């Protein structure tokens, strides 16, 4: 898989998905434009000062959480299958029954403990044959993400693949539950 946009080619129609960590909603738009989602949840606390770059880590921008929430809300206000939730990822995932989602994309704090928690909760909430993926698999810039993904992979004996053309790779787990 060349880039994270290609993930949508793996999705079935009528999927239920969520993006954990939304920033300005650019990747949310890619997911939505794929036409694969019956329900797409965009989850972010949108609080405080939020900093992010483009998908390759360049062009760093800093925004106020309230402004981002307002902007993302306006961007998707007429889309009836998008649900924007101001919540921490682990709180959001805990609400849903196990085996609910077809797709979960993680791009949040980049901290080891939080990423492990999100992966563990995602594994419970993802359906068999679902996809758990996430951004910023880059040893030099986001070593904690790399370590968390490798820990999760070993713990559950789950292989993963990486995008090949992104500077900040996306990791992809194709989930096969017993």
In which residue ranges do the predicted regions lie?
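S-adenosylmethionine/decaboxylated-SAM
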Residues: 4-178
């Amino acid at each position: 898989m060349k880039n994270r946009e290609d993930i949508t080619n793996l999705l079935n129609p009528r999927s239920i998905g969520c993006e954990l960590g939304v920033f300005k909603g650019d990747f949310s738009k890619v997911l939505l434009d794929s036409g694969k989602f019956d329900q797409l949840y965009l989850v972010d606390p949108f609080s405080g000062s939020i900093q992010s770059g483009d998908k390759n880590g360049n062009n760093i921008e800093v925004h106020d959480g309230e402004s981002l929430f307002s902007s993302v809300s306006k961007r998707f206000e007429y889309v009836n299958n998008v649900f924007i939730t101001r919540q921490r990822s682990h709180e959001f995932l805990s609400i849903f029954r196990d085996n609910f989602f077809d797709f979960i994309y993680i791009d949040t704090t980049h901290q080891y403990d939080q990423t492990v928690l999100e992966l563990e909760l995602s594994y419970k909430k993802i359906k068999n044959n679902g996809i758990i993926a996430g951004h910023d698999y880059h040893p030099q810039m986001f070593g904690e993400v790399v370590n968390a993904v490798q820990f999760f992979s070993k713990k559950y004996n789950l292989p993963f693949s990486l995008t090949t053309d992104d500077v900040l790779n996306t990791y992809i787990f194709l989930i096969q539950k017993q």
